[in-house]
Design a protein with these regions (language model features):
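Alpha-helical transmembrane segments
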Residues: 18-19, 213-215, 348, 442-452, ...
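Hydrophobic alpha-helical transmembrane segments
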Residues: 2-12, 130-144, 333-338, 416-442
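Hydrophobic transmembrane alpha-helices and their helix-loop junctions in integral membrane proteins
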Residues: 17-63, 69-366, 370, 384, ...
Length: 559
């Protein structure tokens, strides 16, 4: 159907470009690891295609688990590094928590409706009570929170930067993180009938968008900034789903796939040129040395900042306008996040490409543009980052020009939430759009002016230190969840494992040993003793043989 076919285009289109780019990026790997990398990458794409092509929740779940496994394999691709292995395990475990929610929702559907086929579930949705629908949608959302990195299950995604950069582009742009959006968009009829869950989705999405954007302000690792940017943009998509703008959310998935893949692959090109340096404070002045990377990266930054007529402007604006129609507070908070996005993206751009070079003399000597296999995908993605928005021109500019809305109409036709109860007046929309664009442009100019002459920075203090350390959420999880679990596990190990389980196993062994030692005492080696035993046994046998009835009667009397 239209929704699956749109995701197919995103997955296969961007997946192909990432495969093509990887041939150059991974050329230094040994042949065995080069082959292993592409095997994992293809399995990843296969799992994602299975996820979006399945006609029921079980097939979706199989694809869902497949992308989880492949992300684990790809994040920990360089398995000799223990930090990378830890990041892979973290991603795997965080996703298992979310997957439990998805699995419970599937079981609930089977118990209540006896089917998991989309067509049957949506046709029979009237048989479910309001409580059932709320529980099912909430459990599905827990699954989406894990896969699409929403509060509180988002911490795996920034650590997923441990994998090769093209993997980061594949996970963050085209595939895994959009799976949660796809699932909720696919289940739009269920969510339309669960307003409480929809509000929860909107609030969590908006909170994540702002929260991740604040962390991105103070990150210096080029891939970490883009990772938190992804978490933030996913928050906007969930905001769109939560306010019933399903088309807007899917539109943003598509435009985000183009500009985020572009930014990640651009970052890969920079890291390649800088001999694997990822700290943007040690870069600068790369504009002249990497002209294609610079220009395409700049276009990606403008697109994600939401400057018209680039693609990010149309999709983000559609979500924010729907948010305004639902609750103006959602709009203003979301707009704050958009300003933060513009600021941290142009901080990243300025520190990387403008000003003086701050790296080593060796790096400066060997700076050169990446090979054509890496720059060609950048140019293709840059083209789409600029023009992809035109398939979703808002009604404000031209009535009935929103091609994507017409294309997706059959999928979302059953959801009444799309027709917002109170539509925004065109005059209000013009004012909001004009004001937002003006402020975003001011923020961009401010960020470039502030960071283009950057030399060295003072160590962060106060709130800046907190943002640099990601609000200490990882440390909080470690203290509140991980360490108590370790303590509980050690208690179980020392009491239940050692005393009860090992005690039972070892006790049986000791009992057998003790019994055998007692029987050994009978084997004295004296022939006379053996003859005596044989005679006694023979006498006993004769007595039983001739008195069997009496003995049986006696036994019956006793028992």
């Amino acid at each position: 159907d239209p929704l699956s076919s749109l995701f197919l285009l995103i997955i296969t289109g961007i997946g192909f470009l990432i495969h093509f780019y990887s041939t150059a990026y991974m050329h230094e790997e040994e042949p065995m690891h080069f082959g292993r990398y592409f095997a994992y990458l293809n399995l990843f794409v296969f799992s994602m295609l299975l996820l979006v092509l399945g006609g029921n929740y079980v097939v979706m779940f199989i694809g869902w688990e497949g992308v989880g496994l492949c992300s684990y394999l790809l994040i920990g691709f360089w398995f000799k590094n223990n930090n990378y292995n830890a990041a892979a395990k973290k991603a795997f475990i965080m996703n298992r928590i979310g997957d439990l929610g998805f699995l419970l929702a599937v079981f609930w559907l089977i118990v209540k409706l006896g089917t998991v086929s989309y067509a049957s579930v949506f046709a029979a949705v009237g048989q479910l009570s309001a409580t059932d629908i709320t529980i099912i949608t909430t459990l599905l959302f827990v699954g989406a929170m894990g896969k699409s990195a929403q509060i509180p299950l988002y911490t795996w995604l920034p650590d997923a930067m441990a994998g090769p950069t093209p993997v980061s582009a594949l996970i963050h742009a085209a595939t895994m993180v959009t799976a949660g959006i796809y699932m909720i968009a696919r289940s739009n009829i269920l969510y339309t009938m669960a307003p409480a869950t929809q509000t929860l989705v909107a609030i969590i999405g908006l909170s994540t968008a702002i929260f991740a954007a604040t962390i991105a302000l103070k990150q210096n690792d080029i891939k970490k900034v883009l990772a938190y940017s992804t978490v933030s943009q996913l928050g906007y998509m969930f905001l769109g789903l939560g306010v019933g703008a399903y088309t807007g959310a899917v539109f943003h998935v598509m435009t985000h796939a183009f500009f985020k893949a572009l930014l990640f692959l651009g970052a890969g090109s920079v890291i390649h040129a800088m001999h694997h340096e990822q700290d943007i404070t040690k870069m600068g002045g790369l504009k002249s040395k990497l002209p294609i990377t610079h220009l395409t990266f700049l276009l990606g930054c403008i697109a994600i900042a939401g400057v018209p007529p680039f693609s990010g402007f149309f999709s983000k604006d559609e979500i924010l306008m729907a948010a305004y129609a639902t609750n103006p507070i959602f709009y203003y908070v979301g707009m704050g996040g958009a300003l933060l996005t513009a600021f941290y993206m142009f901080r990243l751009y300025s520190l990387t490409f403008l000003g003086n070079f701050r790296g080593t003399a060796h790096q400066q000597e060997h700076l050169h543009e990446s090979p054509i296999a890496m720059t060609l995908p950048l140019m293709v993605l840059a083209f789409f980052a600029v023009v992809a928005g035109f398939i979703g021109i808002p009604e404000l500019f031209a009535p009935n020009a929103h091609a994507l809305e017409h294309f997706l109409a059959p999928v979302f036709a059953g959801s009444t939430a799309i027709a917002h109860a109170h539509h925004i007046e065109h005059a209000t929309e013009w004012i909001l759009m004009g004001t937002a664009t003006t402020i975003i442009l001011i923020v961009i100019v401010y960020a470039i002016t502030k960071f283009k002459k950057y030399e060295t920075a003072e160590p962060n203090t106060g709130i800046a230190k907190v943002l640099e350390n990601k609000w200490y959420i990882d440390e909080l999880y470690d203290t509140v969840i991980v360490k108590p679990l370790y303590w509980f596990a050690s208690v179980l190990k020392n009491s239940v494992e050692k005393l009860v389980i090992d005690g039972a196993v070892n006790g049986v062994g000791k009992l057998v040993g003790y019994g055998s030692r007692q029987f050994r005492l009978l084997q004295s080696g004296q022939v006379g003793s053996y003859i005596l035993m044989m005679v006694m046994a023979l006498v006993l046998f004769i007595i039983i043989w001739f008195n069997d009835n009496t003995i049986m009667y006696f036994i019956h009397k006793i028992f």
